[in-house]
Amino acid sequence: MSGVEAEPVVPGNTTYGAVLLALDPSVEEVHSVLVEMDERHVPDSGAQGLFTRLRAEGVLTAVVTARQELPSEFLADVVVAADPPDDDPEGPLSGRPHRHPPSASLRLASRQLEVDPEHVVVVTDSHRLVRTAVTEGFGLVVGLGDADRRGPLLAAGAHFVVDDLEALDLPLAPVSGTAAWGGGSGGDSPWNLTYTSFDARQEGLRESLCTLGNGYMATRGAASEARAGGPHYPGTYLAGVYNRLRTDVDGLTVEDEHLVNAPDWTMLQYRVGNGYWYLPTEENALDYAQDLDVRTGVLTRSLRFRDDVGRTTRVTTRRFVSQDQRHLAGQETVFEAEDWSGTLTVRSMVDADVANRNVREYSSLADHHLGAVTVEDLGPGTVLVDTVTSQSQIHLAVAMRTRVLEESRARRSGSMVPVTPAPRVTGHEMRIGMAAGEAVRVEKIVALTTSRDRAISTPALAAAGALAQAGTFEELLSRHVAAWQALWSAFAVATGTGGQEGLAVNLNTFHVLQSVAAAGPDLDAGVPARGLHGEGYRGHIFWDEMFVYPMLTLRRPEWTRSMLAYRYRRLEEARAAARRAGHAGAMFPWQSGSDGREETPTVLFNPRTGRWIPDNSRLQHHVGLAIAHSVWQYFQSTADTRFLVEEGAELMVEVARFFAGLVVHDPRDDRYDITGVMGPDEFHDGYPGTPGSGLRNNAYTNVMTAWLLTRTLEMIDRLGQDYGGPLWQRLDLRDDELVNWKRIRTRLRVPFLAGGVLAQFEGYGDLPEFSWEKYQERYGRIGRLDLILDAEGLSTNDYRLSKQADVLMLLYLFSDRELRELLEQMGYAFPPEAVQATVAFYRTRSAHGSTLSNVVHSWVESRLDRRGSWSFLTRALSSDLVDAQGDTTREGIHLGAMAGSVDILTRCYTGLEIREDMLWFRPAIPPQVPEVTFSIHYRDQPIQIELTPAALRLYLGPGPALPVRVWVDGEVHELRAGEIRHFPVAVPDA
């Protein structure tokens, strides 16, 4: 960077999420940055280059200017028009409507960017605007000017001054402001997601982000006063509880399987005197605060309201879903009469009149999954609700106990009486005498069970028994918090990056754990792509599990094994699917639910046209490759030979058989082709004019097939006859089959473009480029280009574009070294410059329409552009916090992106791999990350890992553990029990 006054000092450790270029609003001063050239005002001083770079990195940009228009080449997310100051000798620019004074212009730009001022960099050539930006509290103020202007700019308060913006080097990343977080923030705490007002527009998003669960069940963070409707959507979901319904859609009968919305146990309604039943709104909540403590798994909400006769009441609610006893949950509500005396009426209920209505796209589908409801009174304040799903015939039971802490007062006020205020809604009503300044506590404990549970007689008896043995709210809460402490001791990741990034890391970890922590041999459930947080994707299981397993395998490998068992139990259905398609082996479904059949709908709804269009994503057979990859990675981490013999080897062999059966030999060049498939990019399901035909030689599929055949052969050789003999006999594994695999793995075709760039598929290079800027300008969010182009009568099949990473998935799953070895085995060179060219090519051709895309791009960029990697990572970390996909997080979080973003910090930035019975480390920590500290369990041995820009520190806990071999930057070392080893880090300059 040229012309910097001394060494620039960036205040604090803040990462800035937006750059605001504020041009001096006098006519002559404008020309100091925008110089007239060929009748166009072209940005000078590097401004255009800076903005181009920032937009590529996902950093928001804004311009405050007095000019009526900016040049077309000068792209900014926000443009705000400003008036010249009153004392400007040229006078105000006339005929320019909707202009703002300088201070208002800066504030307006910040609001339109939805980034708090403290996270905005202001760059300006005006000493007046420097002074204004400092006064308004903007995080960093950079002066722009030559040597003659440097003094006045610094005197006005600029942190430093430059004369060339293109080389401006700042800690920039897509940091989300308070508004973009749905009104939530972490403040100074990396453990608390806090909201300070009620916002009906954001309530669905908040309900998902404040979901509480334990892997067996999860409950959305909805207001306990509300039933489904308007901004509210209470929902409770139990792992593996699915039901099928049929719907007539445009003359066709469509059958869908959904994760079932279970009875709502949180419902608690109340009123003061004979007033209305209170429901919080933006108008009637005097004070409102909601806090999710991810360290303890407790959701707290406090509000004050004043009724229509002026009585003020404070209501504080705490809620948890037990991490200690997976069938239990609790909710405590404290009522305080601030300025009135009289009767408080409270209804504690279970609402079984629920349906699946969380996803607008499914509004035309049948949605009532629960059948008849049976209610039983179990004693004072205790009720049992029993129901059953209509098709799968899964019985669900909810037993609920409600207590008023000062029970003597409750009895004097009429005690508790059973109440059924609406069909299928039941519970108890309490009339409580209150005095001004007095508080009363109402607690409800619930037990939920299903007929899928082990070691029970009936769900009703099991729920009633669990509730009878349950302690008080405080007793259950104490054990719940202790269970979370144990989980955090294994899964916490410290980065030192500050409140918001730290909160995003912890929140993502929290939601992953809530979705899987009950995994075990008794719970037959997979990894739902949207967690247990909503009804998005119908609650189905996709390949997203591949992004979740690494985080689990290195800490709780038994969870990974249990969830891989979900796939193994459905292997027979996958075999049957392959046979029906005319293939050998096992063809796993793109979307899986209860029994492993293909659940992918054949049509999807385009809200832009109101029409249903074909959905051909069931051609993504690569889900089987992901399953096999997860099996092998689990084995590499655990050396669990028993798992291979009992389940893993069979999964790998049958998937290998399927893909080996897909290949067709081309004698012209002695290569093998795979046709009729889709890669990870869902925007290409065929060629122009032939949607749904599949692709020829998708690079990801072909390379992964070669990898699978190689590793399956290695696994067979490793197990040999001693371990695998009976299995090989049962599978009828023949020598000629293995010989065929050995040949296929070396002769599969991989397409390339000019410059050694891996082609996404054969024929990709023949497609025209896409007009990215045109569509971004027209539509803003273009993650769903498939729907946008369909509405225009076009198709994503026609262009060089992708919804998400496809080819680059290979560099996500494999190091560049391992990928190079694979391609060389197949007869192709892939030198380092080809790796860089491939990454650069696809970097600018993705719509990032999947939350997984930023995860993959962050990982891939970590070796080439560490700042760019951090930029992608911050977007991945905040995908659900900012609802990056546009009003989708209310339908459930994106579990793969949450787990994958945390995994980047641990495995990617440390370069951690498990190969050849060693831990491999190749650190590449970005400059924005002061440190990464975490723990893993490698083959039952606890290892603490700490990485800073200067050193890698490894500590193997004391005990009888054998030494662990570690590879660090080309050298192999032994780490012994109780030993701490330090290794200097040579971080690349990228």
PLM regions and their residue ranges:
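Acidic, Mg2+-coordinating phosphoryl-transfer loop and its flanking beta/alpha structural elements
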Residues: 121-160
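Acidic/polar, glycine-enriched structural segments that form the non-catalytic walls/loops
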Residues: 180-537, 792-793, 989-990
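Helix-terminus loop motifs that line ligand-binding clefts
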Residues: 516-533, 558-629, 635, 642-646, ...
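Short, acidic loop-to-helix structural element flanking the phosphoryl-transfer center
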Residues: 36-63, 103, 107
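Active-site core of glycosidic bond-cleaving carbohydrate-active enzymes
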Residues: 538-547, 551-570, 710, 714-717, ...
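Non-catalytic C-terminal accessory modules of carbohydrate-active enzymes
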Residues: 254-308, 314, 823-847, 856-990
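Conserved Lys-Pro-Asp/Glu-containing loop-to-beta segment of HAD-superfamily phosphomonoesterases
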Residues: 18, 98-128
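C-terminal capping/lid segments that line or modulate ligand- or cofactor-binding pockets
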Residues: 202-237, 548, 599, 690-718, ...
